[in-house]
């Protein structure tokens, strides 16, 4: 009887080891995914900052062109 109990215990221990091994593999996969996602977030953040700078530059250029256009229209009205 105690041999059967020992076999059952051994089977449960082996099942626990297998479960732990699978969970460790899953943890490694999730760590890799997390690293990849962090990299993507950093890239997106960098892209966002670049777009904000470009947007500001374009707004400044638009303002300069509007001022030039107003000046030209003012000269045309004078003539």
UniProtKB/Swiss-Prot annotation:
It is found in: Cytoplasm. The keyword Cell division applies. GO terms for cellular component: cytoplasm. Gene3D superfamilies: 1.20.5.340. Pfam families: ZapB. Belongs to the ZapB family. This is Cell division protein ZapB. It comes from Erwinia tasmaniensis (strain DSM 17950 / CFBP 7177 / CIP 109463 / NCPPB 4357 / Et1/99). The lineage of its organism: Bacteria, Pseudomonadati, Pseudomonadota, Gammaproteobacteria, Enterobacterales.
